[in-house]
């Protein structure tokens, strides 16, 4: 996996990431170049129902928050599972993902695998952009080559803009 942001329920209201910028990055042979995962399971209780439940839960002092996240001037070659995999909490969606001047190319011989470390997610291969529970996505000059199926797979995405 390439550039990842990982959090989960239970990390708390002080687990806030906002204004993060990834810029001028080159990646080769990564499984999934961009992963934002709010169902991260690598903690002792990470596989429990509180962390992995896909239904909205009350927002409380244990709910993390992901604000504005920006990726600019990035090239990823020979990706495998997914180009972009953004998985927010239903009760606390990812606020904003902005991508500018990004190129992702898939390995022609890619194998299927798990794009994010979360339970009950299907194995994927050459998945272009997956987003669930994201309030705002903006793509400017984002090129993805060699993907299979639909370019965009969205669920509960508020505003989407691409140019």
Where are these regions (language model features)?
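Extracellular/periplasmic carbohydrate-active domains that bind, remodel
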Residues: 1-163
